Structures are given as structure tokens and as C-alpha cells.
């Protein structure tokens, strides 16, 4: 018997191959979008940290040892920042820790920077 078409089994195997390939493409696209969201959040949080560091420098105040908290609007979202001074071995220098979160009581910060300032 001379068949000119595909058998049902061949069609089912071809569909399975295309379905698996489609799932792999969808998974890759989903991971890519997730990474883009993470990078956007991290970038915006870093900008908030940098804004607050510039503000701290402009005010030229010696930071205290307790946390100072506040919020800032950027890109349609409220970012919650806090900073504190940390004593160093040299009294003329102080470490400045700054954190940014997406929620006031979020467990871990989106961005954290430690820098040093002088009197």
C-alpha cells in the first residue's frame, strides 16, 4: 500500500514536538520579563538612593546614629528610604548606610549603599 499522507501517529508526534518547543519559548519569554521587572525596580531604587545621598551632601549635616526615614515618589511609585550614620575608627569620618524599600515594612531593601562622609 502506497501512502501519500502522514499517519495519525506522525501527526501526534509532530504536535508534541511543537508543543514542547512552544513551552520552552514561553518559559524563556516569561523569565526575560521577570528579569526586566527586577532590573527596572533595582534601577529606580538606586536612583532614589542617589537622590538621597545628594540631598544629604547638600544639607551638610552630620548624620546621627539612629535611622532617619522618609518616602519619595518616582515613576508613579512611592519608595521608602532610610539612612543612618555609623561610627568609624576616625572621628572625622562616618559611614552612611542608606536603604530603599518598596513598602515601609518590607523585609529586605531593594537597594543598599554604604558610603563614607567627612566632617
UniProtKB/Swiss-Prot annotation:
Protein name: Type II secretion system protein I
Maturation-removed propeptide residues: 1-5
Keyword Zinc-finger: no
Alphabetical list of InterPro entries matching this protein: N_methyl_site, Pilin-like, T2SS_GspI_C, T2SS_protein-GspI
Membrane topology: Single-pass membrane protein
UniProt xrefs under Pfam families: N_methyl, T2SSI
Coiled coil: none
Transmembrane segments: 6-26
Family: Belongs to the GSP I family.
PROSITE patterns to which the protein is assigned, alphabetical: PROKAR_NTER_METHYL
Native species: Aeromonas hydrophila
Compartments in which it is found: Cell inner membrane
N-methylmethionine modified-residue sites: 6
